[in-house]
Swiss-Prot record:
Domain of life: Bacteria
Protein name: Medium/long-chain-fatty-acid--CoA ligase FadD17
Gene Ontology MF annotations: ATP binding; cholate-CoA ligase activity; long-chain fatty acid transmembrane transporter activity; long-chain fatty acid-CoA ligase activity; medium-chain fatty acid-CoA ligase activity
Species in which this protein is naturally found: Mycobacterium tuberculosis (strain ATCC 25618 / H37Rv)
Family as reported in the entry's similarity comment: Belongs to the ATP-dependent AMP-binding enzyme family.
A single GO BP: long-chain fatty acid biosynthetic process
Amino acid sequence: MTPTHPTVTELLLPLSEIDDRGVYFEDSFTSWRDHIRHGAAIAAALRERLDPARPPHVGVLLQNTPFFSATLVAGALSGIVPVGLNPVRRGAALAGDIAKADCQLVLTGSGSAEVPADVEHINVDSPEWTDEVAAHRDTEVRFRSADLADLFMLIFTSGTSGDPKAVKCSHRKVAIAGVTITQRFSLGRDDVCYVSMPLFHSNAVLVGWAVAAACQGSMALRRKFSASQFLADVRRYGATYANYVGKPLSYVLATPELPDDADNPLRAVYGNEGVPGDIDRFGRRFGCVVMDGFGSTEGGVAITRTLDTPAGALGPLPGGIQIVDPDTGEPCPTGVVGELVNTAGPGGFEGYYNDEAAEAERMAGGVYHSGDLAYRDDAGYAYFAGRLGDWMRVDGENLGTAPIERVLMRYPDATEVAVYPVPDPVVGDQVMAALVLAPGTKFDADKFRAFLTEQPDLGHKQWPSYVRVSAGLPRTMTFKVIKRQLSAEGVACADPVWPIRR
């Protein structure tokens, strides 16, 4: 460890003596000292339940609550590994994620998605669990000696195959993100970090929660992002820094503009996948600096915008990052779309848990393959051009198409299904599905919507926004669906298209 390369445990150490700063949540405030103590009690209670012969992995299926944050503290203190579980996943899909990550049990709350019946889980809002943790309230707070390479957390994301992968996030990866953002914006003890992005996502953990710990200021947690309450929360908690991923800037900008919007304490906002025009508009309207970066949970390719980066560009390509032809691996000429790769190695990618095949594919030939498409201009600035493979970016979440297709194939009138992205009018993608119906049947949008509602393993973000009904799907000679053609034709195709109301 060095002053600029601490572990997460070392970030938390000074917080254990702080009483005048801490965690804000709704109408409550908990000092850092008490929050760290709560984490120690949770760790002790969990240790009594965990089998020491198995990986100490604990699934977390919670909204942004102090308990979620305290569970991250518990992990840093004890070596227990929190596993962020995405509530978009349901039923057998969620059970598969839990099994893939070797979770011994899952922490849920009153607002959590339903956990499969055969999975051991704890309702952290229950009186029984509250008493169980309270029994350890006098547990001595001990800061274990962690190594930078030690596993801190597993965070699920979707890969090119559509199947979720558990990304390994070490102490180094999480802590250095917090330190970097703290230094970039000169954050300190007087700052309040507003975290409304979901803590099961890497964005909230790395550039939200870890930033609050690194700057030794305070953190304000929002259970679930709300555009209408964003400015009210900033003023209520005195928030000076906030993070985002995807559309939140656009959602906030869509709220009615008032003359005093810039009268607020917010001074810095950091995130990724913001709409270029909205980044500037947000900064002007609310009187703050907005910096939009490019990266992923894996962390193999990261691009930082500079002050002279053109509008719409990701930033200049760093050393070792190239845009190559996905088929040949040769560098692409200026203006030609190719895959972003890291030729220097894995970068910040630390591997997938329990998925050697996916990890080998990601690092084929010793090169990190991001699965993201881009092109560069004459000055060397990169521009995002979509995603290679079978996945979509919807409302800040990576969604695989295969799990959605498996659900839609249950629709009784469908004989063939293809799911693919179409551009969202604001940012990212919308889900579109092409169906081939059984002979003698007609598409009924109300019937289809009722079917979607009844599917226990289909989250709302996975619902198709549009359904195309076709006589047949375009296929290759090896019978694979040509999804790039479907995506290119979009909603303006020759076939009938129905919008599906969520």
